[in-house]
């Protein structure tokens, strides 16, 4: 899952570990350091149960595998969010735009409630 600030949880669902982190951090770090390098996190917009993979906040207990400052792009079937160099509000807008349409209003409400977006 991805939080509206851009941080990524890739190894757990809440407190339940479902995989290792693999090389995600190394890939993101290497891409950021490479001249002209770009990194992408590709996810479906929803879980198999129909829940949004883009969330206002990561689920309680979720581990941050990739911090927000390392994430450059997030891709869903609805487009690409360009996060590098963006403010928290801009990041939230970009991520909401690629969230499943059924969750965009709720994500916008949560972002405004938390002061991420005005």
Where are these regions (language model features)?
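Conserved phosphate- and dinucleotide-binding cores of soluble alpha/beta proteins
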Residues: 1-118
């Amino acid at each position: 899952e991805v939080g509206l600030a851009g941080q990524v949880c890739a190894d757990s669902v809440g407190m339940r570990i479902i995989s290792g982190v693999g090389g995600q951090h190394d890939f993101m770090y290497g891409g950021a350091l490479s001249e002209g390098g770009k990194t992408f996190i590709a996810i479906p917009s929803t879980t198999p149960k129909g829940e949004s993979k883009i969330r206002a906040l990561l689920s309680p207990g979720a581990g941050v595998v990739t911090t927000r400052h390392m994430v450059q792009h997030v891709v869903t079937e609805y487009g690409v969010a360009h996060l590098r160099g963006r403010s928290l509000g801009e990041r939230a807008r970009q991520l909401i735009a690629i969230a499943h349409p059924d969750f965009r209003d709720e994500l916008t409400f949560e972002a405004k409630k938390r002061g991420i977006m005005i």
